[in-house]
Amino acid sequence: MKIILSPAKTMADPEKTMLRPEIESEIIMTRPVFEQRAQALIRLLKGFSEIELKALFKVSDAIARKTLDQINGFGETRPVPAIFAFQGAVYKALAPEAFTGESLVFCRQNLVILSALYGVLNPFDAVFAHRLDFTCKLECGANMTLRKFWTSPIHEWFDENLAADEFIVNLASDEYASLVTKGGLKARVITLAFMEKKGGVLKTVAAHSKQARGLFLRQIVQQRVTEPGMIKSFKVAGYTYDGKISQKNRWVFVLK
């Protein structure tokens, strides 16, 4: 079983990222499997000026400047293990900095972080600060969008690392999950969805859903879940499994 997670735009400051001594010894950073493809994207981005980056990413002057600095200095700063490199709402709820060494090893064996720059990341992979996501209209070649650039390599990686009778538990955002949920993989993909009632209607509230994805992943890690069916019994932060509205490959958890 593999669990997929999306990255976050907010990234850790490598100079301020300090791991507890008892877990730092457990982490030996590895190199991303698609490191060469990531380097090719960085070379492509180095051809953009600050003004062009601002338009490409639709960001402020300050963020465009920071992004340019990250691109030009890519690989020159201290890398951070992927599981500690991202700091969005999902990762705050996950709180990997509080994990035991055994929990981090479980993550290394079972968690995959999808990335628009690196393709797939192991939690222990060395990551440099960057800004890139699939909303970015970066042309990677003739009729080659960023999504097309990554679809085949990511599919091949999952097919090589998972048998047809294995599972992928999807805790990624739709932007990243669509790389694996639109078919073509040998393994079965099960998406966990989180909903709550608003005005008598079940809805997905983005901010709450992000937090729930992090909390559910934390529970999966702490309980060392290796069979997806175990997740149906989870009662986390008020969310419980609703079999009436769930589907075969989309399990819905409703906030009570």
Swiss-Prot record:
Region forming the signal peptide: none
InterPro entries according to UniProt: YaaA
UniProt xrefs under Pfam families: H2O2_YaaD
Superkingdom, taxonomy of origin: Bacteria
Coiled-coil region: none
An annotated GO cellular component: cytosol
GO BP, sorted A to Z: response to hydroperoxide
HAMAP family named in the record: UPF0246
PANTHER family: PEROXIDE STRESS RESISTANCE PROTEIN YAAA (PTHR30283:SF4), PEROXIDE STRESS RESPONSE PROTEIN YAAA (PTHR30283)
Recorded family membership: Belongs to the UPF0246 family.
Name of this protein: UPF0246 protein HRM2_41860
